[in-house]
Amino acid sequence: MTTAPIDNIRNFSIVAHIDHGKSTLADRLIQITGGMSDREMAGKEQVLDSMDIERERGITIKAQTVRLKYRAHDGKDYIFNLMDTPGHVDFAYEVSRSLAACEGSLLVVDASQGVEAQTLANVYHALDAGHEIVPVLNKVDLPAAEPEKIKQQIEDVIGLDASDAVMISAKTGLGVPDVLEAIVTRLPPPKGDRDATLKALLVDSWYDVYLGVVVLVRVVDGVLKKGQRIRMMGTGAAYDVERVGYFTPKMVNVEELGPGEVGFITAAIKEVADTRVGDTITDDKKPVTDMLPGFKPAIPVVFCGLFPVDADDFETLRAAMGKLRLNDASFSFEMETSAALGFGFRCGFLGLLHLEIIQERLSREFDLDLIATAPSVIYKMKLTDGTEMEIHNPVDMPDVVKIAEIEEPWIEATILTPDEYLGSVLKLCQDRRGNQKELTYVGARAMVKYDLPLNEVVFDFYDRLKSVSKGYASFDYHLTDYKPADLVKMQILVNAEPVDALSMLVHRTRAEGRGRAMVEKMKELIPPHMFQIPIQAAIGGKVIARETVRALRKDVTAKCYGGDITRKRKLLEKQKEGKKKMRQFGKVDIPQEAFIAALKVDS
């Protein structure tokens, strides 16, 4: 098949909040245009969500792409390249790179729920990328749907004219053909010059067991052919193209891709790390001089230690992480050791959902039992000798005497919540040291903007927000800057030994509450030993909270009948000596669940 005329190509992505039905709409578009037969679609929902976890949680994690053929009402044949994007804030970089490869977006909004915080964030990404946007109202067949009200809401909140929004129900297929026509008439074709030197954008890459690294590309100028020698401008590496093709979602091989087309190439690339997302691909013999504007690389924001419960699983864990890293360049890890937990890894994630998903994939796909330490963020330390350092593990914090100032990262959070939960949401943000920036109303819902320290958000903010708003509030954030903070390092001591896995940086005002809650939890879960065990929370040398696990005690005087009190006293003294000795040399076993519970404590 020859490459299509550029005016008949439409590249678009679907932008929506979680659960507003974008993967289902993608299924319908594939079905109507014949990308997969009805037999292949049967029993399969969310064709583009290939990971089990994606289907189960109903979220899209990796951006996927599919090419569809469509004969429009004007009798011409069009080629659509649909880029499915994730909706969740942690995967914003997946969204930004899908959008960079398109000219237009379908904005899908649930007609019963309206605009959510992450819809907003993704729409702004699309507007920044210079997209034409077609609003689509989904689930209009539901009894709770209020299309007119939602249209008005789209205009008020986003500022888009939604009067001619397409009304659909992706589940039943109602109105979906109108979406295809809107794509043809309302979205622009790509621009590009077929005769110019090859210039293509590297949109994504992943590892395939048979083909090696598969690279998803969007050709901007020139032609990408099989057998051509290409160069990655960012890394300077050159490769020979082995195969060229596109997805329908099945892989189809072709001879070449022309300007405006989206497809994949494979070359003998060994690791995904060799391909930088957002890089420019060009011809090795006559390279272009200017690179395409890429997108910001994904920077890890949240860090935590992952340790195998069984020390023998360490190598399995290392191999498993290497495999996940093949497909997820934003996940980083390095080895670390902990006195309490043994060998493990310090990992960097884009956010809490990312952390949860990696953890779940490790335990599910590789059958590993893991302990995660408390999540932390990157702090900047200014030292008294004038140097600066960044730390993301509280254990590495230098001596307090050497620190002149600690700075922590802040975020701007946008929260949309129904009016009746506004009070609880505001209280939650205040408790987390937030500063309110603005509060506006969109119909019956409030939109609040808050500045919050990221440290307070990574722990369990999202869960708390969902629980105080009965699941109705939605939340999106972006990093703003670093600000000085009064942070202290809190350690948990068990039998006077610090447990490094539980040490954390907390704000001075919250240290006592946090410390007390943690020691109380630990007291419940550490089983009694033959000697009493003090559990303390301390800042520096000062203990701020303490609980004691009582000792198990044998009745040594049981076999003395009557007789002299000094005999009993001698036995009791002897027992006391033994206990004292035990306490000096005894080792306390801290069970697994005590760690996990202590880390989940909410102060």
UniProtKB/Swiss-Prot annotation:
One of its GO terms (molecular function) is GTP binding. GO terms for biological process: positive regulation of translation. SUPFAM superfamilies: EF-G C-terminal domain-like (SSF54980), P-loop containing nucleoside triphosphate hydrolases (SSF52540). One of its GO terms (cellular component) is plasma membrane. CDD domains: EF4_III (cd16260), LepA (cd01890), lepA_C (cd03709). Its EC number is 3.6.5.n1. GTP binds at D19, H20, G21, K22, S23, T24, N138, K139, V140, D141. It is an enzyme of class 3 (hydrolase). Keywords: Cell inner membrane, Cell membrane, GTP-binding, Hydrolase, Membrane, Nucleotide-binding, Protein biosynthesis. The keyword Transmembrane helix does not apply. It comes from the Bacteria. It is found in: Cell inner membrane. Signal peptide: none annotated. Pfam families: EFG_C, GTP_EFTU, GTP_EFTU_D2, LepA_C. It is a peripheral membrane protein. Its main location: membrane. It catalyses: GTP + H2O = GDP + phosphate + H(+). Residues 7-191 form the tr-type G domain. The keyword Nucleotide-binding applies. Belongs to the TRAFAC class translation factor GTPase superfamily. Classic translation factor GTPase family. LepA subfamily. NCBIfam families: lepA, small_GTP. PANTHER family: TRANSLATION FACTOR GUF1 HOMOLOG, CHLOROPLASTIC, TRANSLATION FACTOR GUF1-RELATED. Required for accurate and efficient protein synthesis under certain stress conditions. May act as a fidelity factor of the translation reaction, by catalyzing a one-codon backward translocation of tRNAs on improperly translocated ribosomes. Back-translocation proceeds from a post-translocation (POST) complex to a pre-translocation (PRE) complex, thus giving elongation factor G a second chance to translocate the tRNAs correctly. Binds to ribosomes in a GTP-dependent manner. This is Elongation factor 4. It comes from Rhodopseudomonas palustris (strain TIE-1).
